[in-house]
């Protein structure tokens, strides 16, 4: 099992838990909109570190982005497997062609 799959399982286990028991439970209890907002904040922080060029800080922020993406997906009951299946579907297809097909 990959680290992302284990993280997804941990997030799922916290869904519906007492919001005071963990940051994940607290975030999920606030609803999908708050989860999306937090994902956006973390994405912006990663962008800033990418522009600055600090490798260690970018790595840390990228980890935050992945975590908050999984929380946002869980808030909307979208499994990581669904996202991975979509990536597999797109694999080998030109980005220009794929975008035109939407």
UniProtKB/Swiss-Prot annotation:
InterPro entries: HisE, PRib-ATP_PPHydrolase-like. Keywords: Amino-acid biosynthesis, ATP-binding, Cytoplasm, Histidine biosynthesis, Hydrolase, Nucleotide-binding. Belongs to the PRA-PH family. GO terms for biological process: L-histidine biosynthetic process. Its main location: cytoplasm. The gene is hisE. GO terms for molecular function: ATP binding; phosphoribosyl-ATP diphosphatase activity. SUPFAM superfamilies: all-alpha NTP pyrophosphatases. One of its GO terms (cellular component) is cytoplasm. Its EC number is 3.6.1.31. It comes from the Bacteria. Pathway: Amino-acid biosynthesis; L-histidine biosynthesis; L-histidine from 5-phospho-alpha-D-ribose 1-diphosphate: step 2/9. This is Phosphoribosyl-ATP pyrophosphatase. It is an enzyme of class 3 (hydrolase). NCBIfam families: histidine_hisI, PRK00400.1-3, PRK00400.1-5. It is found in: Cytoplasm. PANTHER family: HISTIDINE BIOSYNTHESIS BIFUNCTIONAL PROTEIN, HISTIDINE BIOSYNTHESIS BIFUNCTIONAL PROTEIN HISIE. It catalyses: 1-(5-phospho-beta-D-ribosyl)-ATP + H2O = 1-(5-phospho-beta-D-ribosyl)-5'-AMP + diphosphate + H(+).
